[in-house]
């Protein structure tokens, strides 16, 4: 009866009353999976005027605790696994725990490919490209056994990101736990500057080249239509081939993002103080969710240094 009242209160928009009743339900029946899942969702803030509201660290942590209980009682609740993965990685920055979380989903649903997508993304973010490649191979084999155009397209995009980032890493790698890594000097040199946006890069680099080539084409080709088609083709072609240059220019941002992810994953600090108070750091951290920033602030205050021998605990395939 209390559970029905809780659902009714939620439908009427009284989230606070609904949450209180759901909590009462689990206090009486700890095995009520639906009530635990409701607590996980109702703990999160409600969207306001079409704008997605982000949870703070306490809300995210409370929701995550309820999600853990949900999947323990109902391992087949795919929606709960997805929400848990998003909170753990996107809102709390616990990427290493995220790998373990998706291992749990594999145990519950061995044929589900979502865990592999998520784990590859985490490994790429943390710079573990060899392991990411191994997971991708398994993912490709799984998709071959259950053909799907959407999954194939998604896997293709993920592989493109992997190959692009892995290629960049082969040119210049970065291990945040190593305070003597040369890439820290690169980040430090660029700490007073913001990254170059793709729009700015296209306007200041790609468009002038296209304009010059287009002007030359107009002098040679009499047809306006042909010239327009050539300009469009040149624009997309140059934009595609110049993307690698943009990635190189923005390496400091990419490396700093990795260092921040390592800090949040390990619970220990590795970013030098001169970089932490820089314009680049402020730009990067503002893109993270409020709960991520809040948790990172707690880690910063603890001041416990990241050991040089730290390494990610990657689940075996």
Show which residues each predicted segment covers.
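Canonical positions in the second alpha-helix
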Residues: 24-25, 69-70, 104-105, 138-142
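TPR/TPR-like (Sel1-like) alpha-helical repeat modules
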Residues: 58-65, 107, 121-147, 160, ...
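Structural signature of tandem alpha-helical TPR/SEL1-like repeats
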Residues: 12-20, 47-66, 92-104, 128-135
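Transmembrane alpha-helical hairpins and terminal membrane-anchor modules
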Residues: 192-262
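Short coil turns that delineate tetratricopeptide repeat
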Residues: 30, 75, 110, 144-147
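TPR alpha-solenoid repeat register
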Residues: 35, 80, 115, 148-150
């Amino acid at each position: 009866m209390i559970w029905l009242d809780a659902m009714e209160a939620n439908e009427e928009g009284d989230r606070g009353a609904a949450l209180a009743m759901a909590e009462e339900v689990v206090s009486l029946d700890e095995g009520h999976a639906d009530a635990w899942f409701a607590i996980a969702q109702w703990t999160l803030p409600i969207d306001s005027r079409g704008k997605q509201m982000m949870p703070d660290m306490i809300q995210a942590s409370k929701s995550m605790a309820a999600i853990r209980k949900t999947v323990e009682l109902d391992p087949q609740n795919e929606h709960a696994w997805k929400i848990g993965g998003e909170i753990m990685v996107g809102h709390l920055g616990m990427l290493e725990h995220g790998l373990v979380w998706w291992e749990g989903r594999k145990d519950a649903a061995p044929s589900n490919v979502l865990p592999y997508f998520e784990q590859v993304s985490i490994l790429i973010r943390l710079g573990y490209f060899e392991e990411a490649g191994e997971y991708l191979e398994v993912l490709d084999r799984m998709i071959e056994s259950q053909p799907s155009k959407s999954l194939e397209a998604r896997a293709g995009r993920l592989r493109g990101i992997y190959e692009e980032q892995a290629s960049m890493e082969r040119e210049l790698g970065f291990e945040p736990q190593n305070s003597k890594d040369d890439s820290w000097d690169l980040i430090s040199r660029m700490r007073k500057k913001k990254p170059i946006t793709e729009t700015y890069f296209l306007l200041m680099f790609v468009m002038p080249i296209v304009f010059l080539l287009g002007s030359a084409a107009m002098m040679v080709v009499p047809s306006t239509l042909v010239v327009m088609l050539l300009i469009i083709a040149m624009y997309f072609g140059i934009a595609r081939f110049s993307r690698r240059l943009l990635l190189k220019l923005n390496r400091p941002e990419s490396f700093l993002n990795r260092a921040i992810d390592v800090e949040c994953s390990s619970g220990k600090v590795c970013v030098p103080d001169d970089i932490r108070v820089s314009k680049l750091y402020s730009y990067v951290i503002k893109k993270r969710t409020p709960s991520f920033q809040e948790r990172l602030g707690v880690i910063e205050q603890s001041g416990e240094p990241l050991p040089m021998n730290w390494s990610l605990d990657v689940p075996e395939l």
